[in-house]
Amino acid sequence: MKKRLLMGLLVLLSSVTNVANAALELIITDGIDSARPIAIVPFKWQGTKALPVDISSVVASDLQRSGKFSPVPTSKMPQTPYNESEINFDAWTNLGVDTLLTGSVTQNEKGEYVINYQLVDVVRGQLTSGQSRALEDGQLVLSKDHVLFNKVATITAPRMREYAHRISDLIYEQLTGERGAFLTRIAYVVVNDKDKFPYQLRVADYDGFNERLVLRSKQPLMSPAWSPDGRRLAYVSFQNGQAEIFVLNIYTGEHEKLTSFPRHNGAPRFSPDGKKLAIVLSKTGSLQIYTLDLQTRQLTQITRDRSNNTEPFWHPDGKSLIFTSDRGGKPQIYRVNLSDGSTSRLTWQGSQNLGGQITPDGRFLIMVNRSDSGFNLAKQDLETGAVQVLTKTLLDESPSIAPNGGMVIYSSIYDKKNVLSMVSIDGRFKARLPATNGRVRAPAWSPFL
């Protein structure tokens, strides 16, 4: 079945194309008053022209979106130190800040940008007046142990925003012990009825910047899903008059059709090791879940009842799948063990639960929960069963979890059209990424890149 295709009506952009002007704009809709205060001081820059990217602004925005940090507004900063030696520790601790990022940017003779930056423990710096001592070779010497890290990087202008996300990742990991997910991407489908090719598959940085068009079609595109290496996207296309599953290499443009069984082919999802796809087929009647070995093309049926079973998602250990089924009358989320086929129901609160995903640590189930207030994202503790509704947006669907489990992106309705929205895993931070030129659906968060 491995067959190279000319897409016909589906136009593949063999070299990834930048979309003119940012098509997604992140708008904060709910704050994080209880998050940890942190100071991201504007970096010093003495060049004749403006920096290509405001590094400190990108870092502050990243940390705020995580829901764990509350960056101090620049207007409320008591000073703007450009290195550790200039910090007035008392002034910052009086503001309630315990950690501060400071830095500077210069330009070398090659036109590259040299970034020096430090993350400082303000409380420890205050206690030691920035002059603590430590034993070294049996002698007390001055120590800078209040400096959590001190780094230098040389980058080009096109990489500056990317490197700002890298700084955010370093801070996040230093302060939380968890890996940051700011150097990741999202894939999504944009629908614009006025365009010659109204269905477009796009990829952007997680915050909506650097959007690129990778595929466009006159027929619907659905259900993009990333491979674990972040190089391929599985998706559903109706280019031949029915739903079929394809895989696209977003770097080379190479793609192939994987399934074209009678009736429905949908909901592809890569296994954690990237060797299989979980898919949904209706070739025997109702919707059933299968796994497809990508090397041998062996198809294995997982569910076998008369109900409709769909939206498979792999447990992080790769040994089971969760899925949505109407076997109880209305959609609820179940789990099936791939070794013996045993199945158990996971959701009990709410008249419907669907679109389930499990966080990378295996602790929580993120899902669309229907209650009297409508369809909203909810989080269920898989050990205790406790459910927390995370959103108050309208007609939520298609949740996708960041690879570190810290945030969720999803589709909702705003101003009568589909937009992407974002919520931190604890529900404290919320934002919208509305498109300026169409309806946006089916987001998929990439793995770590």
Swiss-Prot record:
Q: Which InterPro entries match?
A: 6-blade_b-propeller_TolB-like, PD40, Tol-Pal_TolB, TolB_N
Q: What is its main location?
A: periplasm
A single GO cellular-component term on record: periplasmic space
Q: Which superkingdom is the protein from?
A: Bacteria
Q: Which Gene3D superfamilies match?
A: TolB, C-terminal domain (2.120.10.30), TolB, N-terminal domain (3.40.50.10070)
Which keywords belong to this entry? Cell cycle, Cell division, Periplasm, Signal
So which residues are the signal peptide here?
Answer: 1-22
Q: Name the Gene Ontology biological process terms.
A: cell division; protein import
Instruction: Check the record and name the PANTHER family matching this protein.
Output: PROTEIN TOLB, PROTEIN TOLB HOMOLOG
Q: What's the family? A: Belongs to the TolB family.
Oligomeric and partner information: The Tol-Pal system is composed of five core proteins: the inner membrane proteins TolA, TolQ and TolR, the periplasmic protein TolB and the outer membrane protein Pal. They form a network linking the inner and outer membranes and the peptidoglycan layer.
Q: What does this protein do?
A: Part of the Tol-Pal system, which plays a role in outer membrane invagination during cell division and is important for maintaining outer membrane integrity.
**HAMAP family given in the database record:** TolB (MF_00671)
How is this protein named in the record? Tol-Pal system protein TolB
Query: From which organism does this entry originate?
Result: Vibrio vulnificus (strain CMCP6)
Supply the source organism's classification.
Answer: Bacteria, Pseudomonadati, Pseudomonadota, Gammaproteobacteria, Vibrionales
